[in-house]
Amino acid sequence: MSYLPKPKMHHPDMPTNALGYTRRDYEGPISTLCAGCGHDSISAAIVRACFELDLPPHRIAKLSGIGCSSKTPTYFLGASHGFNSVHGRMPSVLTGANLANRDLIYLGVSGDGDSASIGIGQFLHAIRRAVNMVYIVENNGVYGLTKGQFSATSDRGAKSKRGVINHDEAIDMASMALQMGATYVARSFSGDKTQLIPLIQGALEHPGAAFIDCISPCVAFNNHDGSTKSYDYVREHNEAVNQLDMINGRDEILVDYAPGTVELVTQHDGSVLQLRKLAQDYDVHDRGAALAYLQRKKEDGEIPTGLLFVDPEPQEMHGYLKTTTKPLNELREADLVPGAAALEKLNASLR
């Protein structure tokens, strides 16, 4: 992956987190993406989210597929484990890694071409299997590496930079994640870090399949009049359903709010999602209502953003598979080959 090394010097008084790390310790090399690319804003949001959550970089595994979006893990969390897989296959690689070692925090980064076209089957199965992961789709509506053709998430009626009209129906990744059983579903905009950073933090702390559809304008091929993924269009049609604040489980929870305007959602690890309702009739715990809301707003030409759905009691793959709590590379021969007596007991249980 192409990159430019970043100077390691920084101000001696740069703030540190509880681990003693500065924000620079969560960065990577200098990005080689186009100047102004929305993907770089998402990378910056990931850096800040991990820094503020005091996450040890070596405990994070970042995985990606192929595309502009899949280049971005090079540019953040330089001290983390990384794997750049083949086109559309990141979800399967992530699932296998998660099964082998549940102790890591898994962050999958993909794009609308990588996950909504060639990798759509991989995406759907990873979500329905309840893999404990954060899955971010950097959604720009075009194939940026191959000069701006429409992707599967491009809206019907959208116009390409060359003036071509898209006649195909768009795939809504957030709706598909809801249908497949994701227990944390959000949508955001790369140009809104105030909204995006807490959404990423909430996803990182969520013990289940967390999905974020992040609209990320392509400044080279999809930031013009007629595009429904441009900076101007998204800003004009963005309708936030709520504003999320992330309260770390290790911090004292001090909340001052008016009844009916804020909802607190406590997760298994003690972290708290503080939701400031903007759409008063929106229920973040109703999966069916969330799907209906997305469809209704799509017909109105609006782009709902914010935390769309969260299940405070999520199911997670290791829980229902009853897998070992130890990483596979720590299992000894006695654990893997318990002997003839154990085999006979297993066979007897199946008769």
Segments and roles (model prediction):
Residues 1-144, 197, 327-351:
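Thiamine diphosphate
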Residues 2-19, 220-351:
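Flexible, low-complexity linker and terminal segments
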Residues 26, 35, 53-57, 98-102, ...:
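Solvent-exposed alpha-helices and their adjacent loops that cap or buttress functional pockets
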Residues 35, 108-110, 184-189:
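Short catalytic-loop micro-motif centered on adjacent basic/acidic residues
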Residues 40-45, 57, 88, 92, ...:
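Conserved active-site and cofactor/substrate-binding residues in soluble primary-metabolism enzymes
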Residues 117-118, 125-133, 138, 142-283:
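Glycine-rich ThDP/TPP pyrophosphate-binding loop and its adjacent helix/strand module
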